[in-house]
């Protein structure tokens, strides 16, 4: 199990502080980020294009938009701290960038949990070539 967790942390294909975001996703959904969220739909994973395929993919679209609104931050690499109080993610102290990145990741992890019932396995490892429709604006 430890090897699987390390692999998930290393391979998770979402932007942000990979360790913290992967941990949040696992805690919220009880699913490993890899394979469930790394190549899902048109937006989960590196980059994104086209129209989100469903509510889970929309979580990733909104997450990408959230990162896009951060100025002078490095969401792919900046580490942050968070804790839980009564099961709720509480973003910790840190720089304004760290706090904003944490809030983006928190919103995505909670969104994944809220949409577990509509998650569709057919969108796992979804080919980019099927994401050709014009992209939405954030």
From Swiss-Prot:
The keyword Phosphoprotein does not apply. The active site is at 63, 105. Disulfide bonds join 42-131, 44-60, 59-111, 65-138, 66-104, 73-97, 91-102. InterPro entries: PLipase_A2, PLipase_A2_Asp_AS, PLipase_A2_dom, PLipase_A2_dom_sf, PLipase_A2_His_AS. GO terms for molecular function: calcium ion binding; calcium-dependent phospholipase A2 activity; phospholipid binding; toxin activity. The keyword NAD does not apply. High level of membrane cholesterol content reduces cytolytic activity, whereas low level of membrane cholesterol content increases cytolytic activity. One of its GO terms (cellular component) is extracellular region. Expressed by the venom gland. SUPFAM superfamilies: Phospholipase A2, PLA2 (SSF48619). CDD domains: PLA2c. Its EC number is 3.1.1.4. Binds 1 Ca(2+) ion. One of its GO terms (biological process) is lipid catabolic process. Its main location: secreted. It is found in: Secreted. Ca(2+) binds at residues 43, 45, 47, 64. Keywords: Antibiotic, Antimicrobial, Calcium, Disulfide bond, Hydrolase, Lipid degradation, Lipid metabolism, Metal-binding, Myotoxin, Secreted, Signal, Toxin. Its cofactor is Ca(2+). Snake venom phospholipase A2 (PLA2) that displays local myotoxic activity. It also displays anticoagulant action in plasma and edema-inducing activities. In addition, it shows cytotoxic activity to a variety of cell types and bactericidal activity to a variety of Gram-negative and Gram-positive bacteria. PLA2 catalyzes the calcium-dependent hydrolysis of the 2-acyl groups in 3-sn-phosphoglycerides. Belongs to the phospholipase A2 family. Group II subfamily. D49 sub-subfamily. Monomer. Homodimer; non-covalently linked (alternative/compact dimer conformation). This is Basic phospholipase A2 myotoxin I. It comes from Bothrops asper (Terciopelo).
């Amino acid at each position: 199990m430890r090897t699987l967790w390390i692999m998930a942390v290393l391979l998770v294909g979402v932007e942000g502080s990979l360790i913290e975001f992967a941990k949040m996703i696992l805690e919220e959904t009880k699913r490993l980020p890899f394979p469930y969220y790394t190549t899902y739909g048109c937006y989960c994973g590196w980059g994104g294009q086209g129209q989100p395929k469903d509510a889970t993919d929309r979580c990733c679209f909104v997450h990408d938009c959230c990162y896009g609104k951060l100025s002078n931050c490095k969401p792919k690499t900046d580490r942050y701290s968070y804790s839980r109080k009564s099961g709720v993610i509480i973003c910790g102290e840190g720089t304004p960038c760290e706090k904003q990145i944490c809030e983006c990741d928190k919103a995505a992890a909670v969104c994944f949990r809220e949409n577990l019932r509509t998650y569709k396995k057919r969108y796992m490892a979804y080919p980019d070539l099927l994401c050709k429709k014009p992209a939405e604006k954030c």
